């Protein structure tokens, strides 16, 4: 907030469910600058597809598309991700940028650094994906994310048990 005025407000709550390492369902509600958004995604075992009911997309999609919550390392292999905020399908390019050492809370991690970008170049700038993600090389644990959207944002691992 600046001079008592909120410049950006974001609140989200989500649940992602897997059984035997297989995606079952995801649900989220998000308030972003007073706009309500949601995403509900279910795996339909009979049709072998994902059913998406979101504020930006409703329909079925490939079961190999992954919810864009970043913790699932398999996202680096996916042709598209599903927005955890709105259910929007985001076709992506993933580029490996190299290995890097990152220190967080006095602990050093050897990481693999990736850039995720929208493969659809016609999207408006505010809809384009352009996010850097770092995964621990040994465990594939999500260590860090950064992106530039209404300012530079960086998320880092706080602790890991």
Language-model regions: role of each:
Residues 1-44, 74-161:
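Acidic, serine/threonine-rich low-complexity disordered tracts
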Residues 26-70:
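Hydrophobic, well-structured mid-protein blocks that either form specific transmembrane helices
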């Amino acid at each position: 907030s600046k001079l008592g005025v909120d410049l950006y407000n974001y609140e989200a709550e989500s649940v992602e469910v897997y059984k035997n390492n297989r995606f079952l369902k995801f649900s989220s509600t998000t308030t972003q600058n007073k706009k309500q958004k949601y995403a509900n995604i279910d795996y339909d075992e009979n049709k072998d597809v994902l059913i998406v009911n979101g504020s930006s997309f409703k329909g079925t999609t490939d079961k190999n598309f992954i919810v864009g919550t970043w913790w699932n390392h398999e996202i680096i292999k996916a042709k598209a991700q599903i927005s955890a905020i709105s259910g929007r399908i985001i076709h992506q390019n993933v580029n490996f940028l190299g290995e890097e050492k990152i220190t967080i809370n006095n602990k050093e991690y050897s990481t693999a650094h990736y850039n995720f970008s929208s493969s659809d170049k016609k999207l408006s700038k505010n809809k384009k994906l352009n996010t850097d993600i770092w995964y621990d090389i040994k465990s594939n644990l999500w260590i860090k994310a950064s992106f530039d959207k209404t300012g530079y944002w960086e998320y880092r691992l706080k602790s890991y048990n």
